[in-house]
């Protein structure tokens, strides 16, 4: 008596976390140069993440060479999986061969294929933050379980990457880099580069007891030390967070 053969595959609805890249220029040379400048030295930033390309912020007469952007992203270890476009942009946007996605990163209803069987939600849009309030002490932000703790100073050229929160108990020197998917806590001078929320966590923060960094970044929004830090924060305890897609510096109260 024959038994029913088990299927070798199935196609079903699903979800995959994805980042959302929104170019604001169709000048691919400039865009590629800026992406390379920001991320070529931090290959862990994307680490083979999937990414949706949102072209809706481009002007009506602009057409981005998406195939070239995909090539640039691939070189930075990011994998483009679709394009978010307005109805007017749809024709040229999908000419690159990537599927069209809706504003949430999902393939529109009624369009199904093996290549796009799984719907892909985009990273959440930033939610406007409430009016600024007095800076809370460090204890106000819960540390994620399994935080990485570094007890030695980080010298120039050293780089540390944490999947959750990162705690550094000694100096982060010029040229050193601390990267975390969660929050970053530096209980010493922060003189190098600190990148928190690198997987798109808009709630991530950076805390340090002496603010002197070359660069700070939260969820890809960054500021460099080329412009002097405000006197109220330079070489002082501070925390950095996002508010309405802008980096906000606040004094850190030490108990």
Curated annotation (Swiss-Prot):
Stored InterPro entries: CAP/MinC_C, MinC, MinC_C_sf, MinC_N, Septum_form_inhib_MinC_C
UniProt biased composition (Pro residues): 127-136
Short name of one Pfam family: MinC_C
Entry keyword annotation includes Mitochondrion: no
Source organism superkingdom: Bacteria
Chain intervals for the UniProt region annotation (Disordered): 103-136
GO biological process, one term: regulation of cell septum assembly
Cell cycle in keyword set: yes
Ranges of compositional bias, category Basic and acidic residues: 103-115
UniProt KW keywords: Cell cycle, Cell division, Septation
Known partners and oligomeric status: Interacts with MinD and FtsZ.
Membership in a protein family: Belongs to the MinC family.
Free-text function comment from the UniProt entry: Cell division inhibitor that blocks the formation of polar Z ring septums. Rapidly oscillates between the poles of the cell to destabilize FtsZ filaments that have formed before they mature into polar Z rings. Prevents FtsZ polymerization.
The protein's name in its UniProt record: Probable septum site-determining protein MinC
Species of the source: Ralstonia nicotianae (strain ATCC BAA-1114 / GMI1000) (Ralstonia solanacearum)
Phylogenetic classification of the source organism: Bacteria, Pseudomonadati, Pseudomonadota, Betaproteobacteria, Burkholderiales
